């Protein structure tokens, strides 16, 4: 009986994924699409866009950073939502 109870507790912990972390895209506009598992506590993804002599640059990653004026920032809170 104790073995069954212990097994149920272990299965419950594994299924609940108590250490859940967010997954976000983390590639720049000119790079192949890649993802990153964010650090614990980072619950959002961002998409940051700006223009320079190379054209429009898009940067993606975990978190929701503070940006300078003239930089477009979008933050979201679901899996790989920052494409």
UniProtKB/Swiss-Prot annotation:
Changing residue 74 to A: 2-fold decrease in potency of inhibition of Torpedo marmorata acetylcholine receptor. This is Erabutoxin a. Its main location: secreted. Residues 1-21 form the signal peptide. Residues 39-44 are annotated as: Stretch between loop I and loop II. GO terms for molecular function: acetylcholine receptor inhibitor activity; ion channel regulator activity; toxin activity. Changing residue 65 to V: 3-fold decrease in potency of inhibition of Torpedo marmorata acetylcholine receptor. Residues 24-38 are annotated as: Loop I. Changing residue 69 to Q: No change in potency of inhibition of Torpedo marmorata acetylcholine receptor. Gene3D superfamilies: CD59. PROSITE patterns: SNAKE_TOXIN. Belongs to the three-finger toxin family. Short-chain subfamily. Type I alpha-neurotoxin sub-subfamily. Changing residue 57 to A: 7-fold increase in potency of inhibition of Torpedo marmorata acetylcholine receptor. Residues 45-62 are annotated as: Loop II. The record marks 28, 50, 52, 57, 59, 68 as: Very important residue for binding to acetylcholine receptor. It is found in: Secreted. Binds with high affinity to muscular nicotinic acetylcholine receptors (nAChRs) (tested on Torpedo marmorata, Kd=21 uM) and with low affinity to neuronal alpha-7/CHRNA7 nAChRs (tested on chimeric alpha-7/CHRNA7, Kd=0.07 nM) and inhibits acetylcholine from binding to the receptor, thereby impairing neuromuscular transmission. Blocks the extracellular increase of dopamine evoked by nicotine at 4.2 uM concentrations. In vivo, produces peripheral paralysis.
């Amino acid at each position: 009986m104790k073995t069954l109870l212990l097994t149920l507790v272990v299965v419950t912990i594994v299924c609940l994924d108590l250490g859940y972390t967010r997954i976000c895209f983390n590639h720049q506009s000119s790079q192949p699409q890649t993802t990153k598992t964010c650090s614990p506590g980072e619950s959002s993804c961002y998409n940051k866009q700006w223009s320079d002599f190379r054209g429009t640059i898009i940067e993606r990653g975990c978190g929701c950073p503070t940006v300078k004026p003239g930089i477009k920032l979008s933050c979201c809170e679901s899996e790989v939502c920052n494409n």
